Amino acid sequence: MNRYLKRFVVLGAIATSASAHEIASNRATLVLRDGQHLSLTFFVDYPSVLHQVLAPQRPLKEFVLMHAAMKPQEFQSHLLDAQRKLQSAIGMKLDNGKSAALTQWAWPQAKAVQAALQQRAMQSVVAPADHAHEAQMQIRAQASSSNKSDFTTVTLQLPLQFQQMLVVSYQPKQVWIKPGAASPAIEF
């Protein structure tokens, strides 16, 4: 039995060092296509964001344990409440000062969010001193305009719960390549 315990400890140490990396920061990617369609994707530590939205007065560990153990229907209700609050706090202004309508919101599924909370809860019991390394979750939205000049400059307003966020924006260059033909010069 002692031999197996030693192997487990060694394998755990290897796995921990192999997965050690810098903490991923919250970030947003804005992609403008055809001058009229803007896609927004937010990559966030969703369990921490939910904690700040739903119960900032509680310790994170308590919040995680409580929500990880909730019945799925109850958790779904809490999650929808948080999504409404976050969605109302996310805004985008155009260069002319008008607000852009953000539509087609896509949020992480309740089952995946609760699974992430359950994983974090298990880690807090098994290895409380270790930092959680789960993947960030995505929140998506779209904006569109019939006027190509509307999206030349935009300003984002983000909820405080997102913390500091790195924003990457770009307008991809797209070309079609016919079968068997070489592409035109691709510039970077």
Task: Give short role names for the model-derived ranges.
Residues 11-12, 26:
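Intrinsically disordered, low-complexity segments enriched in polar/charged small residues
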Residues 15-17:
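N-terminal signal peptide c-region/cleavage motif recognized by signal peptidases
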Residues 2-11:
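Sec-dependent signal peptide recognition
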Residues 21-188:
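N-terminal soluble domains immediately following signal/targeting peptides that reside
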